[in-house]
Amino acid sequence: MKKLTIFLVLLLTAGDAFSQQQAGMNKQELLEYFDQTFANIQTEIEGLNAEQLKFSPGEGRWSVSQCLYHLVITEPQLLEFVRQAMDAPADPSLKDSVKITDRDIIMAVTDRSHKAKAENELTDAPVYSSPREALSALESSRKIIKDFIGKYTEEELRNKVIKWPVGYADAFQGLLFIAAHAARHTEQMKEVKSDPSFPKLP
C-alpha cells in the first residue's frame, strides 16, 4: 500500500494544478467508469499467453500479471477504507474541506509521469496462466464494489468525507479513485506490451 499512499499525496496536492471548478460526476457515470476500466483491461490482456503475462520489461518493473494481481489485492483494501468512512458518523463541517474535484482525481491518478519501483509484495506474486483467470478474480471484486455503490445515494456518498494524511476527499471520490487506479495500471500494461522484448505470439 506504500505506493498508493504516494499516489494519494500526489493526488491531493495536485488540486491547484489540475482543478477547473466544474460539475462532478454522478453515480451512473461512476458505475460506467468502473465498467469502462474493466472493459479496457479486458481488451489489453485478451489473447495473451502465460509467457506474455509474466514478462517483465526489466528489474523493478511489473509484468502484466503483477499489474493485474496488484489490482485484485488493492481494490478490496481501498473499498474497505471507503466502507469505514460510510459507517462512521457524518461530519458536515468537513464538507467544505474537500477542495479536489473528480476531474483532478482521474487526471492525477492516471498520470504515468509519476512512477514508483515495484513493491516487494509483488515480486513473488502468483502468475496468472490466462487472461480469463485474472479477469475472473477482478470481476468478483468489481461486483462487490458495484453492489456497495448501489446501497447508497449520490448524496450519501458525497456527504461522507475521508481524511487522508494530506487532505480531504469525499467517499464518492474514494470510489472514483479505485476505478482511476485501474485505468493507471491499464496504461502500465500497455507500456509492458510495447516493450521491444515483449514475447510475440507464435
Regions found by a protein language model. Name each.
Residues 1-25, 202:
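Bacterial Sec-dependent N-terminal signal peptides
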Residues 21-42:
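Short N-terminal segments immediately surrounding and downstream of signal-peptide cleavage
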Residues 24-30, 52-58, 63-69, 124-133, ...:
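Second-shell loop/turn segments in exported
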Residues 33-39, 136, 154-156:
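Metal-centered catalytic cores of metalloenzymes
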Residues 34, 134-138, 175-178:
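Hydrophobic packing residues in well-ordered alpha-helices of helical domains and bundles
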Residues 43-58, 116-128, 143-174:
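Acidic interhelical loop/turn segments
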Residues 55-105, 151, 155-202:
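Short, contiguous alpha-helical
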Residues 86-149:
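Surface-exposed, polar helix/loop patches in the mature regions of secreted/periplasmic/lumenal proteins
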